[in-house]
A protein has these predicted regions:
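Structural and coupling elements of P-loop NTPases
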Residues: 1-731
Length: 731
């Protein structure tokens, strides 16, 4: 594994369609923004012969960062597939954004992959978000390896970074996180930094020198061997500890020299099972070089150590009616089950869907059943519809190469599935099936928007609908209380990209306006009101008088209407008219224009005219009576309160609780969870947590998560209510 003498780059270069699941590896790259994932993909593509030269992120020339937004921001904002071929194996490299706002793209990559490469910068280390993703992979048993990048940095220390990785990723078993290679350093520069020029293979005791631009293998000198023996022995012990051969440890402890072939085979099996996590090193190719440092070794690990799709547990599948269905593992001849990992709208070819096939074989012009269930609350309506597949293609960044088929275990792009959304299931039209939906984080940053002009209004709805269909981490809300269009996002960068795509893809200019919460009004004490609507200036007139009493009710009671009229002062047929007028006025509000709630309105008395009284007249009188009752009453402004649950590392619990208190929150309690984390439960006014998604990330260095849910409305403090009223008056 990476210790072979063969240095020949994959002759096939760019991969096309696979013919058997055993010849496919689906690998997602995970790491924080700036860790070097995109640069590593570029180096692997160069070594595999898929590109003639490696592009640079700074120049906008990389294969996987091809979007204009990515070029401007110089960071990935979307999932990108770069398939390459090495030693007859098709490797689907899934490059994901490292910034937390684009975790939906990461989730899509994890769903499509069978193994993960965690990319760690030698100069920056492991951040909390990367640890959290590691734990998620561990929970589902996904095989993982670690690649240390930025070895060219002046302060890069591979051995120290290996120790940090073992501490961060190997809490349960640090001896399962060990390097397979050590960096080979060139002559020391005047500044004291010795650049990395190659690698030393621990198992093979071979040197792999990349100084010439291509990998050259040699034997170390006798004086160099002692420097690697300690690391080699620890690696051997780590491999043996994870071996399924229970006699191997006894033989090793008994003094037997275990042959390298046996060790490599056991290492490969342990990696594929997800019980051993090798650490490798990589650096981009120098100008004019054909191979980056460590790229051959990494490609060897992927092809020989990472599992095939045949080794992945079959996904949970049901009929569209919810009946469980058992599938054979990744059978190209089985019933079609594929998942839309990602959708995107192209201005020239329409909607394009990246699909992972889990069973069966997908072909162009095939009619499939598209099922989408489970995200109705985010604007994704349930749908079951038959559609014809357009062209199939293998993406290579923004380029597409036509395919004749896509078998179980492989990925492809599908054109012209107009109804398919991210997370949907594709199956045979005569045997519709549904995959269990994947979990996505809740979008918790509200972005209130409105069309910039009349011309933009017609396009806004369509543009927003398409954005939400592509990205299930967005949620579209038409707030009936505030009459605002709200796009819920994961963070500010997520929101910025959404606005840019509205403009560039759909030609929609929008204005961002302050987000409002749904306030309510209520009476603080009992009050009475008289509504008089009399117009009798000749001809058919209008006459209605009613007297009401309004009293407060407990929160959540709504509007209660009671008739206590005696003696027919208000004719029976007009009492519903009074109630209708009262409820209509309550919906408009009686003080600041917010709906009135939680009151009992009692109709006490009134007067009518045999000719001039009417339904409309008593509706008007009812509304006037409620408004008069409000003029002499104390009206409380009610604000929505949210139940907030924050899962945070123990070291940040104090800061989180203090911050919640500063937002007028009430901490209800804490609960210790696994992994040194605490669940903090609180109730906080919604008006105080509009930007909490951004603020919490800063407070916890990206390691905390939170959930919010509406609890109730309750009276707003007088000084806050006055500030809100003043803001509303100022526009």
């Amino acid at each position: 594994m990476g210790d072979k003498a063969n240095t020949h780059p994959g002759a096939a270069g760019r991969a096309t369609a696979a013919d058997h699941p055993a010849s496919v590896r689906n690998v997602v790259l995970v790491g924080h923004s700036g860790s070097g994932k995109t640069t590593l993909v570029e180096a692997l593509a160069l070594t595999a012969g898929a590109v003639n030269r490696a592009g640079r992120v700074e120049d906008g020339g990389t294969v996987s960062d091809y979007d204009d937004i990515e070029h401007r921001q110089q960071r990935s904002v979307q999932l990108s597939l770069v398939p390459v071929e090495w030693d007859g194996i098709k490797i689907n490299l899934l490059d994901t954004p490292g910034y937390a706002d684009f975790v939906g793209e990461l989730r899509a990559g994890l769903r499509a992959a069978d193994a993960a490469l965690f990319v760690v910068s030698a100069s920056d280390g492991v951040d909390g978000s990367t640890r959290m993703v590691w734990d998620e992979c561990a929970a589902v048993g996904m095989p993982r390896a670690i690649v240390v990048t930025h070895l060219e940095a002046a302060r890069a220390d591979f051995e120290e970074m290996t120790r940090i990785c073992a501490e961060a990723f190997g809490a349960d078993d640090p001896d399962a996180v060990l390097p397979l290679y050590l960096p080979l350093h060139g002559p020391q520069a005047p500044d004291g930094h010795a650049p990395v020029t190659g690698l030393t293979g621990l198992l093979s005791r071979k040197l792999f020198d990349y100084a010439s631009g291509e990998r050259k293998e040699s034997d170390p000198g006798e004086d160099e061997l002692p420097g690697i023996e300690e690391a080699r022995n620890r690696l051997i012990e780590g491999i043996i500890a994870e071996s399924e051969d229970e006699t191997l440890m006894d033989r090793y402890l008994g003094g037997e020299q275990i042959d390298v072939k046996t060790l490599i085979e056991d290492l490969e099996r342990a990696v594929a099972r997800g019980t051993f996590f090798p650490v490798l090193a990589a650096a981009p190719a120098a100008e004019g070089a054909r191979q980056g440092i460590g790229t051959v070794e990494l490609l060897e690990l992927v092809t020989r150590g990472f599992p095939t799709p045949l080794e992945r547990e079959a996904p949970r599948v049901t009929t569209v009616d919810g009946e469980p269905r058992t599938l054979d593992l990744c059978d190209p001849d089985g019933p079609l089950v594929a998942e839309v990992v990602k959708t995107a709208s192209d201005p020239y070819v329409g909607r394009v869907s990246l699909v992972r096939v889990f069973s069966g074989t997908l072909r162009p012009d095939q009619t499939v059943h598209v099922s989408g269930h489970g995200l109705t609350d985010r604007g994704h309506e349930d749908h079951d519809v038959d559609e014809r597949v357009g062209a199939l293609s293998a993406p290579f960044g923004k380029q597409q190469r036509a395919l004749t088929h896509c078998i179980a275990g492989d990925l492809a792009c599908v054109a012209k599935l107009s109804r398919a959304e991210t997370g949907d299931t594709l199956s045979a039209k005569d045997d519709p099936l549904l995959m269990e939906p994947w979990q996505m984080p809740d979008p918790l940053l509200p972005l209130a928007i409105q069309a910039h002009s009349k011309a933009d209004e017609d396009k806004l709805s369509q543009g927003l609908s398409r954005l939400v269909a592509e990205d299930p981490t967005m949620r579209l809300e038409q707030n009936q209380g505030t009459h605002q269009v709200v796009l819920w996002c994961l963070g500010e960068a997520h929101a910025d990209v959404a606005l840019e795509r509205l403009r560039s893809r759909y030609g929609v200019q929008v204005d961002v306006v302050p987000h409002k919460v749904s306030l309510r009004e209520t009476f603080a004490a009992r009050s009475t009101g008289r509504g008089r609507h009399v117009k009798q200036s000749g001809g058919h007139g209008q006459f209605a008088i009613c007297e009401i009493e309004v009293e407060p009710l407990p929160g959540g009671s709504g509007i209660e209407f009671v008739d206590k009229v005696v003696g027919g002062a208000v004719p029976r047929q007009f009492i519903p008219s009074v109630e209708k007028g009262v409820r209509a006025q309550a919906a408009k509000g009686v003080a600041a224009g917010h709906p009135l709630v939680d009151v009992r309105v009692t109709l006490l008395d009134g007067k009518a005219h045999s000719v001039d009284s009417s339904d409309a007249a008593f509706q008007t009188a009812g509304a006037l009576a409620l408004r008069e009752a409000a003029t002499d009453a104390r009206i409380h402004l009610l604000e929505p309160v949210a139940e907030v649950s924050v899962l945070v590392g123990d070291e940040y619990v104090g800061a989180v609780m203090s911050d919640l208190s500063g937002r007028r929150g009430r901490v209800l309690g804490t609960e210790q969870t696994s992994g040194g984390r605490t669940l903090v439960r609180a109730e906080v006014p919604e008006i105080e947590i509009g930007r909490y998604a951004v603020d919490l990330r800063s407070l916890s260095h990206g390691t905390a998560r939170f959930h919010r849910a509406y609890a109730r409305h309750e009276p707003m403090p007088a000084q806050v209510a006055e500030r809100i009223r003043q803001q509303e008056q100022d526009g």
